[in-house]
Amino acid sequence: IKLQIQRLIRMKKNGNPAWTERFDEISAEVLRQIDMLADTANEFSTFAKLYTEEPVEIDLDRLLKEEIDLFDSRDNIRFAYMGLEGATVMGPKPQLTRVFVNLINNAVQAIENAQAEAGERGGEAFIGRIVISLRLSTKEGFYDIVFEDNGPGVSDDNRARLFTPNFTTKSNGTGLGLSICRNILEKCDAEIFYSKSFALKGACFTVRFPRKRS
């Protein structure tokens, strides 16, 4: 960031007329890097809180509906939710909220990137679809929260590294999001795994969470 700003200052000081043309480009890059640094700081802050937040009773159905409502205003993506009333678990609510937001946001970004690439190639436009399901797991005593989309999915080469710290396919990603999600879930005796969506042909992330004991 510092080098780019210094370069811009030198161009202006030396009377280089190109500095005005470079201003927008460098400003956009500086803002992108600032956002990335902020994301990194937030990710490490989340790591620090993993051991300090006390578990509380959480209504999964209500929490998921609240988070979906934050995203369900786009014209280019359709959301569908299949819930389960009375699905309660114990966990740190702010951290679980972060997990769900991260997974939804990843799906949104993957779809929007695919839509943009299709437009650049002159390909056929498509409406994104994200389906989130909350249901009883086939594993006794657990709930499954399934996040599916019709984006490009994850390549076979990248699947093994999905939850590895610092691995990302995003140009401005920190590579900590899914790694932190897994750490949060492991602290709750939960797990997360990836598969290809059979119905939508894109990504499918399943969070398997232990039911609250009565």
Identify what each model region corresponds to.
Residues 1-35:
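Histidine phosphotransfer helical core of two-component systems
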Residues 50-53, 88-91, 169:
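Conserved micro-motifs of the catalytic ATP-binding
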Residues 54-68:
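A conserved beta-strand-to-alpha-helix junction within the catalytic ATP-binding
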Residues 78-88:
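Conserved catalytic submotifs in the C-terminal HATPase_c
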Residues 142, 154-165:
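Short conserved segment of the HATPase_c
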Residues 177, 181:
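Short alpha-helical Gxxx[C/S/T] motif in the catalytic ATP-binding
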Residues 185-186:
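Detector for a conserved hydrophobic position within an alpha-helical segment of the HATPase_c
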Residues 190-191:
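Conserved glycine-rich
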